[in-house]
């Protein structure tokens, strides 16, 4: 079982960060591994919303379909799904004096090639999650700076 957790503080209000990260239509702006994404229904997002992603990971294209199983506005967003293997991804949002702490937890039970290369998969996944959250931070904070200038 692979279990990766990373976090970041984004200097923006929790409602803004939550809304941005839970709308799959925003994902291509910050998720470099994403090839295609479809969300049904497109809005409003909530428990039962389904997301189908095609992504490139470790040189392979994978399609996964997940479903939102937990949706607590400005607090928690969790998706569970499958594809080549079971996955669970959770975003937890906490207010801080600087803005919002986002904690991203990702669990998966790899099979086949990915099971054999579990340490490599774990390192690569951690880098991808950290880079994604860093891109969200840069995007939201620069957008806010542009609005105030």
Predicted regions and their residues:
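A short, structured loop/turn motif at beta-sheet edges
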Residues: 14-15, 42-45, 69-74, 92-101
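Hydrophobic pocket/interface hotspot
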Residues: 16-21, 27, 51, 68, ...
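Beta-strand/loop substructures that line and gate deep hydrophobic ligand-binding cavities in soluble
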Residues: 80-131, 138, 148-149
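Short beta-strand segments that buttress and anchor functional surface loops
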Residues: 50-56, 76-82
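Short, cysteine-centered beta-strand-loop-beta hairpins and adjacent loop/turn segments enriched
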Residues: 56-62, 110-113
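Hydrophobic/aromatic beta-strand elements that line small-molecule binding cavities or substrate pockets
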Residues: 6-8, 39, 64-69, 88-95, ...
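Hydrophobic ligand-binding cavity/cleft-lining segments
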Residues: 1-40, 46, 135-138, 148-149
